[in-house]
Structure formats: C-alpha cells, structure tokens
C-alpha cells in the first residue's frame, strides 16, 4: 500500500468515527429532550388539572360535572377566539404580501398543471354516464368560403409591378414614355 492510500483510509476511518460520535451525541440529546418534555407535561397537568376527587353523593357529582362543562366551554371559546384571530392575521398577511407583489410589479403565478382529460371526458365525469355529451367545438365556427373578389384581383394585378418596371426599363421604355408625353 502506498502512503496516499493509507492517508485516504485513515481520513475515511476518522470521518466515520466522527460521524458515529456525532450520532451518539444526537441520540442522547434527543432522549434528554423527550424526558424534559415529559417532565414539563407532567408539571403542566399537575398545575392546571386539579386532582380528581369523587364526592359521595349524586348532587355533588352533578355539580362537579357542571363545573367541568363550564370549564370546557370556556376553553372552547378561547380556542375559537384564537382561531379567528389566526385566520384574520393570515388573511391580513396574504393581503399585505399581495400588495407587496403589486408594488414590485411581480405577480405570483400559480403553476399550471397538465390536464390529461379531453373536454368530452371532463363533461362526462361532471354530468355522469347517463347523459350523452358530445362537444364538437368546430360546430359553432362560422363557415367561410373563399371567393375571388375584385379586390383580390386588383391586388394580384398590383403585384405584377415587376413586369411594369421591366417594360419601362431600358431604351425602349424611355422611348415609349417620351412618345406618350408628345401626344
């Protein structure tokens, strides 16, 4: 083995060792975080949820249920209020970002997706298989027949300007122009 191969192998072995050491550290950190979250959860539950004491009589049990229902209602109201606030702020954020795009002159275009369905298949899917749908898009087009009009003939005649130039060029053309001018 040459020195270069030994160096390469040593470098790769060192890299592998460093990777494994980093992975071991990451695993221990994740385990510590999970344990900390569990402790935090237990503390929160102990703080916010009083221990359950079941009273002996039916009257006391009904009062406890009423208290719990009232607490559930208040929590639901808070949750609903926070959801409404979140929706408002999201809408406001979208409006502001749209204004920003408008001011910059850059419009965010949604990505177009290829539709692999023909118009007939799309209508069949929408209306169901009971309705027979045939969508001939050419049926509504206006029928146009090509006719030779005088304008087109005049345009073709004007298009023969090369012949007119050739006739007027040279001595013969000048002679014709001169003779036409005398008479």
Curated annotation (Swiss-Prot):
Sites of N-acetylserine modification: 2
InterPro entries in UniProt: Troponin, Troponin_I, Troponin_sf
Region (Involved in binding TNC): 2-48
Lineage start: Eukaryota, Metazoa, Chordata, Craniata, Vertebrata
SUPFAM superfamilies: Troponin coil-coiled subunits
Subunit structure: Binds to actin and tropomyosin.
Protein name, per record: Troponin I, fast skeletal muscle
Keyword Chloroplast on entry: no
An example Gene Ontology CC term for this record: troponin complex
Disulfide linkage: none
Keyword Acetylation included in the entry's annotation: yes
Organism of provenance: Gallus gallus
Segments of this protein annotated with the region Involved in binding TNC and actin: 97-117
Function of the protein: Troponin I is the inhibitory subunit of troponin, the thin filament regulatory complex which confers calcium-sensitivity to striated muscle actomyosin ATPase activity.
Post-translational modification (record): The N-terminus is blocked.
Protein encoded by which gene: TNNI2
Gene3D superfamilies: 1.20.5.350, 6.10.250.180
GO molecular function: actin binding
Coiled-coil segments on the chain, per record: none
Keyword vocabulary terms for this entry: Acetylation, Actin-binding, Muscle protein
GO aspect biological process, one term: skeletal muscle contraction
One protein family per Pfam: Troponin
Family: Belongs to the troponin I family.
């Amino acid at each position: 083995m040459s020195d270069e191969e030994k160096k390469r192998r040593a470098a790769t072995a060192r890299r592998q060792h460093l990777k494994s050491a980093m992975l071991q550290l990451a695993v221990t950190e994740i385990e510590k975080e999970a344990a900390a979250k569990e402790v935090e959860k237990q503390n929160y539950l102990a703080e916010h949820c009083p221990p359950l004491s079941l009273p002996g009589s039916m009257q006391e049990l009904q009062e406890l249920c009423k208290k719990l229902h009232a607490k559930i209602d208040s929590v639901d109201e808070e949750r609903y209020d926070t959801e409404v606030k979140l929706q408002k702020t999201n809408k406001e954020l979208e409006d502001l970002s749209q204004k920003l795009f408008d001011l910059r002159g850059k419009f965010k275009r949604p990505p177009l997706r290829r539709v692999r369905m023909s118009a007939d298949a799309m209508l069949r899917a929408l209306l169901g298989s009971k309705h027979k749908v045939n969508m001939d898009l050419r049926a509504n087009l206006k029928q146009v027949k090509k006719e030779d009009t005088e304008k087109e003939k005049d345009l073709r005649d004007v298009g023969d300007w090369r012949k007119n130039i050739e006739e007027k060029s040279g001595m013969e053309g000048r002679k014709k122009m001169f003779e036409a001018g005398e008479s």
